[in-house]
């Protein structure tokens, strides 16, 4: 609709389908040991700067000012998921800790790139954050691949998985990449 270009409107039948997909998502993630979380749509600019997202994505972020402070509508869920994890102390015995979120995200896509429901400015992102020990990396990767396979097979989707390694403009410590990348290959 021209009143909200790139922002989908879901009519009653579309909502029935969307809710069935959400129910399916909850069922398979619960069975795989995920805890569902929800994080705010608007978070402070300071958080986005601290996470590194501001430097990488600010051109695609919608911003606002609240009480003289800069905020942004989230283009991704990661910083919020990290805040949920950091909300309390965890023992290594709590790990792996799997958190899943169907978070609503907004990205300022160029108007020429918009295409039906395939390329929009607001969408629900199936996101997961797994907190684990180094020794658990391999098993957790296997679990994620099995979960992906289960979902894609259910819907008859064909897929191909490739391993992406550290890009030049990556976020995160090089030491963490150096540990995780070789384990991912095995």
For each predicted feature, which ranges?
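Hydrophobic face of alpha-helices
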Residues: 18, 22, 26, 138-145, ...
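Conserved alpha/beta enzyme-core scaffolds, especially Rossmann-like or related mixed alpha/beta domains
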Residues: 1-12, 119-178
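Conserved small/polar residues in nucleotide/adenosyl-binding loops
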Residues: 185-186
């Amino acid at each position: 609709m021209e009143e909200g270009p790139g922002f989908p409107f879901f009519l009653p039948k579309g909502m029935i389908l969307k809710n069935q997909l959400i129910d399916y998502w909850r069922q398979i993630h619960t069975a795989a040991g995920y805890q569902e979380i929800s994080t705010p749509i608007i978070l402070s600019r300071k958080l986005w700067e601290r996470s590194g997202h501001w430097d990488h994505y600010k051109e695609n972020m919608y911003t606002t000012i609240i009480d003289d402070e800069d905020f942004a509508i989230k283009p991704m869920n990661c910083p919020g998921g990290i805040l949920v994890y950091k909300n309390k102390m965890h023992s290594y015995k709590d790990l792996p800790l799997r958190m899943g979120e169907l978070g609503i995200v907004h990205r300022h896509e160029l108007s020429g790139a918009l295409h039906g429901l395939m390329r929009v400015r607001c969408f629900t992102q199936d996101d997961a954050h797994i907190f684990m020990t180094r020794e658990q990396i391999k098993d957790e990767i296997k679990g994620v691949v099995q979960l992906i396979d289960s979902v894609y097979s259910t819907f008859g989707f064909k897929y191909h998985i490739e391993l992406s390694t550290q890009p030049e403009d990556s976020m995160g410590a090089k030491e963490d990449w150096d540990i995780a990348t070789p384990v991912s290959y095995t």
